């Protein structure tokens, strides 16, 4: 029994060492599922890697190109997983080499069950074998789903794959996609780099879609389910609010709000649109340097809601160097006026042990979308369009 315990402990330490430096800020990249589902092949992945460089996504910080479900073929006589020979005739190793040649990283998908959500071979019973295969191919990121896994213990199943990745000899970011069913935030910090907190995102701002076999949540519904979870997030271990739907049909105001919310909440930023054909407005939204800087702030603290006044909510995120990000969110489909008297506010966060009394400290602010500037010596007044945000970065004295 002692030997088993020591073995598990040593493997856990090994994983920590190999994972060192991965996801020190929320991971940024692209995933095939939201836009393409099972309609994927190696040409799409290559063209997406090209577009990631050509459109400035790589320069903005997006680095992972992740293949989701349906890349699988069958297992060979020795049980080794093979890619679909029609979709990926060159093989995954050649694809990884191509992506790496662009200065990017390649991610892949599997499932804790015997079959994936798309009905392809999962990793159940083949965890160590699959991890070795991924390492041999040059994989940098593993998204691990939870279909066909009803009889399994989630923590044990994900820990097995964590240990398999550690033993493979190649560092890989490990993304748990368990949909929040078994409260992964309570145990996954020592298992993976991020964990999904909700069912899948659906391409809408405020809706819930249940086609009968699954549930899809809009942006606001996912935000609401983050209540109480911020204490579990931090460098190397993040609450994952699912992939982005920016550029997939919501309004520009909704797209800006969507990215802002994910950045404030320190969720991974995984693009879910077609990078090859996105509009210039979508590209500008997704590469906004100020919003991305909030997402990637090295302090790694998730935002807290500090005000809820009807459809208007205010979220605050402490940043490195004594700065703050502040987001005013209009949840309504009607415009909302903001009249914010800074001097009546004391901004306090028990988690980061930070507090600002605006009577004593004047902070400058910059609007991360409009580029307007001001300071907290005067009231903030603005009109928020439906489903929009005002996102500010506060800079000033570090005295708290």
Feature locations, PLM:
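Bacterial N-terminal signal peptides
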Residues: 1-9
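Glycan-recognition surfaces
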Residues: 126-129, 173-274
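Carbohydrate-binding surface patches
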Residues: 262-265, 270-272, 308-351
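Aromatic-lined carbohydrate-binding/catalytic grooves of carbohydrate-active enzymes
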Residues: 48, 52-151
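Catalytic cores of secreted or luminal carbohydrate-active enzymes
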Residues: 257-306
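C-terminal beta-strand-rich structural cap/linker in extracellular carbohydrate-active enzymes
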Residues: 377-400
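Aromatic-lined carbohydrate-recognition surfaces of secreted/lumenal glycan-active proteins
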Residues: 104-120, 166-183
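Conserved, mostly hydrophobic/aromatic
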Residues: 30, 65, 99, 174, ...
